[in-house]
Amino acid sequence: MYPHLTGLGIHDPSQIERYSLRQEAHKDVLKIYFHKQKGEFFAKSVKFKYPRQVKNVLVDSGSHQYKEVTEINRNLTLVIDELNKITKPPKQEDVDIKQKILTDLKHLEKVVASKIAEIEADLEKLK
C-alpha cells in the first residue's frame, strides 16, 4: 500500500505520527517520527537524506545566460505523498460548490462596482 515507505524499511506505516522536512546545503533531510511506545521517554525517529536535483534554467534568452537551480528529489516527493496520506486526514468538502460560486460572484460584483465608482470619481476630477 505504501511502496516507497516500505522501500525505506518502514514496514508498519500505521506507527508514523508525523514528519519534518528541512534543507541542509544540497540535501533535503526527511525525519519521520513514530508514535511513542509504552515505557519510552522519547518517540523513535528515523532520518533520511536526499540529494537535491540540480538543473540549469535559462534566465535570459538574449544573452543565453543560465542559472543553476536545485529542486526536490522525485523519490522524496513520492515518499512525502505517502506520508501525507498517513499523517493528514482527508479534507472534508463542507462548502457546497454552487454556494461557493454564488459567494465568489457576489464578491466580484462588489469589487467591480467599487472600481467603477473609483474610475467615475477620477473622471469627475478631470472636468
Curated annotation (Swiss-Prot):
InterPro entries: UPF0325. It comes from the Bacteria. Pfam families: DUF3461. Belongs to the UPF0325 family. This is UPF0325 protein VV2560. It comes from Vibrio vulnificus (strain YJ016).
